[in-house]
A protein has these predicted regions:
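Basic, Lys/Arg-enriched alpha-helical interface segments
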Residues: 2-57
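Enriched for short, Lys/Arg-rich terminal
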Residues: 29, 62, 67-68, 72-93
Length: 93
């Protein structure tokens, strides 16, 4: 199964990387790598996250990070919608 990234998710990952790099380049690299590895797992196990609603939205907590990936599962691909820090109270449109 293929994985596609929505613009928001791509922007979220870029923002996370930039923010963390200001604090610690090593932490930024480690966190971004963990997020990317979690996304790669979705190719093989698209339903590994928790289903959030009836529209097919899922969430996956990224191990050893405070980040959550929101994504939708389609018959032929997984679409990454957003990446949030667990302290954020944001909603997807």
């Amino acid at each position: 199964m293929t994985v596609t990234w929505g613009k928001k998710a791509h922007d979220d990952l870029d923002g996370i990387a930039k923010y963390l790099a200001e604090l610690s380049p090593q932490a930024a690299e480690k966190t971004v790598t963990r997020i990317q590895k979690a996304v790669l797992l979705l190719r093989e196990f698209p339903n590994m996250g928790t289903k959030v609603d009836e529209t097919g939205l899922h969430r996956l907590v990224v191990s050893d990070t405070p980040y959550v990936i929101f994504y939708r599962v389609f018959p032929d691909h997984v679409n990454i919608r957003a990446i949030f820090h667990t302290s954020q109270r944001r909603f997807l449109e």
